[in-house]
Amino acid sequence: MLQHKFVKKELIDKGWSGDKKYCVTDEHGNKFLLRVSPFEQYERKKSEFEIMNRVAALGVPMCKPLEFGTFDEGVFSIQTWIDGVDAEENAQNLTSDEQYFYGFEAGRILKEIHRVPAPEGIEDWEIF
């Protein structure tokens, strides 16, 4: 059951997942990312949420997982909101040096993420 009370909900019509994604705002003006998935994906989404907690504990700059559960629309997770711009739309506005810097930084962050062991039953991602 949702522990947060939201006063505003805006659909985010981007991204690669089939999840419904929303920018939600609480009564204090704080923004969060709300992801909603079908009930059938409960176990998978629970595992993703647990992995996100382990990755966040490493200090990786990311949306921090706050809450997970079910409600009348399906399985949900609530994460902290990070303001920013869409890299796909804005990368061409950066200099070559800036693009290199952000690409290098993304690789460094990905290396940190790979410190988290692959879950049981999933092929070890060290081979990638």
Question: What annotation goes with each model-predicted range?
Answer:
Residues 1-8:
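Juxta-kinase regulatory segment immediately upstream of eukaryotic protein kinase catalytic domains
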Residues 10-127:
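ATP-binding pocket architecture of kinase catalytic cores
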